[in-house]
Amino acid sequence: MGLEKSLFLFSLLVLVLGWVQPSLGVESRETPAQKFERQHMDEEGPFPSSPTYCNEMMKSRGMTSGWCKSMNTFVHEPLATVQAICSQGQVTCKNGRNNCHKSSSTLRITDCRLKGSSKYPNCDYTTTNSQKHIIIACEGNPLVPVHFDDSV
């Protein structure tokens, strides 16, 4: 009888997981490189001129679903330019790992910072454009960007 109960509970668990898995968002099926592209790449044109750029981008890229991400940076350069940073100067990441690389030249970026009074679901961001070196973590073979670490 104990075996039958265990078998029933296991079958029920498999059934529930089968229902839950398809309902998970795109984010759960992304590779780290795809997540980096979704969260940080915006190759379109020059610096954004709209003061609501960050509000629009953070929402459209899925970074305000269930909570407001406090800070994010978008890079306005071709993906190939950012991928090439993985073969440039290696530096230590903020978390102490040694898989970060610093761009040899400055890149066009936009920082999105959550305003202090902003609360989910009304995520409100300040938009700041600048030109800085970026530091990204790279993994894989070939190396590809998987994490935006900093801008300097």
Swiss-Prot record:
Pfam families: RnaseA. One of its GO terms (molecular function) is ribonuclease A activity. Substrate binds at residues 35, 38, 69-73, 94, 113. Residues 1-25 form the signal peptide. It is an enzyme of class 4 (lyase). It catalyses: an [RNA] containing cytidine + H2O = an [RNA]-3'-cytidine-3'-phosphate + a 5'-hydroxy-ribonucleotide-3'-[RNA]; an [RNA] containing uridine + H2O = an [RNA]-3'-uridine-3'-phosphate + a 5'-hydroxy-ribonucleotide-3'-[RNA]. One of its GO terms (cellular component) is extracellular region. Keywords: Disulfide bond, Endonuclease, Hydrolase, Lyase, Nuclease, Secreted, Signal. The active site is at 40 (proton acceptor), 147 (proton donor). Disulfide bonds join 54-112, 68-123, 86-138, 93-100. It is found in: Secreted. InterPro entries: RNaseA, RNaseA-like_dom_sf, RNaseA_AS, RNaseA_domain. Its EC number is 4.6.1.18. Its main location: secreted. SUPFAM superfamilies: RNase A-like. One of its GO terms (biological process) is defense response to Gram-positive bacterium. Belongs to the pancreatic ribonuclease family. Monomer. Endonuclease that catalyzes the cleavage of RNA on the 3' side of pyrimidine nucleotides. Acts on single-stranded and double-stranded RNA. This is Ribonuclease pancreatic gamma-type. It comes from Rattus norvegicus (Rat).
